[in-house]
A protein has these predicted regions:
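Bacterial N-terminal signal peptides that target proteins for export
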Residues: 1-11
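Extracellular beta-strand/beta-solenoid scaffold signature
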Residues: 76-77, 84, 103-115, 133-141, ...
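Residues on the solvent-exposed faces and adjacent turns
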Residues: 33, 67, 79, 91-93, ...
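Acidic Gly/Asp/Thr-rich repetitive segments characteristic of extracellular carbohydrate-active
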Residues: 31-71, 76
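Right-handed parallel beta-helix/beta-spiral solenoid domain characteristic of secreted/periplasmic
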Residues: 45-46, 64-67, 80-135, 156-162
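Bacterial N-terminal signal peptides
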Residues: 9-20
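Boundary at the C-terminal end of the N-terminal hydrophobic targeting segment
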Residues: 21-26
């Protein structure tokens, strides 16, 4: 029964409909890359950077980001949401693509782009993360609970020489519980896609994502060898995380189950033109 309950979010389909359903619960904050200084977050006077809105947004609030390019490093929401009242980050409809990029200053600059670590019920939806090499990850959910990353695109990310143990994946879930990574696109990635890692990881969902053209990067322990996994699941005593309905094409390794990784649920994942489907 626990496994069935875990799969319910897949059947409900975390989609644009679900994201729209969260709007209107609280206050709206607006962000535009073209805005001047001194904005107050209203539609008429938007903030210039996403962090300004993220600091203020509380449970039930939505941060609307106007289409454009945003250079972001270590963005940290100031508040958690609550069950049914997420803090939501999404593009402002009708304004074009929101592209988020790490500043990529130095190879040793291992900071996350969006840092949801320790937060609960934050929803990140509809952004494009593109063309950066040195970030620790695009989204960090270390110790997070109930957070969602949906309908985002992750394109041309990573660098083969970055070998830090915690800078291998696009999305990092360490000791996280009940989070969802759904309906996203990962293309041309160096390294790992989604990592579910840690003894306290439980009840996380990775579903309905597509993974295309992955290649390897170094590991701190691996010498000159290069490694890549689209979904990496390891080091957990509880397990009961679900990996379902994902699609993989032109990747070396689709799903890697390591050190208690077999305690989890895999359902109806598909692969085409890949070397290894599931490694345990």
């Amino acid at each position: 029964m626990k496994s069935l309950n875990l799969m319910k979010p897949v059947l409900l389909c975390f989609s644009a409909f679900m994201l729209h359903a969260l709007e209107g619960q609280g206050k709206g904050y607006y962000v535009s890359a073209a805005a001047g200084d001194g904005g107050d977050g209203t539609h008429v006077r938007p903030f210039k950077d996403i962090q300004a809105a993220a600091t203020l947004a509380e449970a039930g609030d939505t941060v609307y980001v106007t289409g454009g390019l945003y250079v972001v490093e270590g963005l940290k929401p100031g508040h958690s949401g609550s069950e049914g009242r997420f803090v939501v980050f999404r593009p402002l409809p009708g304004t074009g693509e929101v592209v988020v990029r790490h500043p990529d200053v130095l190879p040793g600059d291992y900071s996350a782009v969006f840092d949801l670590s320790g937060l609960k019920y934050v929803w990140l939806g509809g952004f494009t993360f593109r063309d950066f090499k040195y970030a620790k990850c695009a989204v960090s959910m270390n110790g997070s609970e109930g957070c969602v990353v949906s309908r985002c695109r992750f394109e041309r990310l990573g660098h083969p020489e970055v070998a830090s143990w915690n800078a291998n994946s696009v999305i990092w879930m360490g000791n996280a519980r009940g989070n969802s990574v759904v309906d996203n696109v990962f293309e041309d990635i160096i390294g790992d896609g989604v990592s579910i890692n840690g003894q306290q990881c439980n009840g996380n969902l990775v579903a309905r994502n597509s993974f295309t053209r992955f290649s390897g990067k170094k590991r701190s322990w691996g010498g000159e060898s290069l490694f890549t996994r689209c979904i990496d699941v390891q080091d957990m005593s509880d397990g009961n995380n679900a990996v379902a309905f994902n699609y993989f094409t032109e990747v070396p390794t689709c799903i890697w189950l390591d050190r208690d990784g077999s305690r989890n649920i895999l359902l109806r994942n598909r692969a085409h033109a890949c070397r290894d489907f599931i490694v345990q």
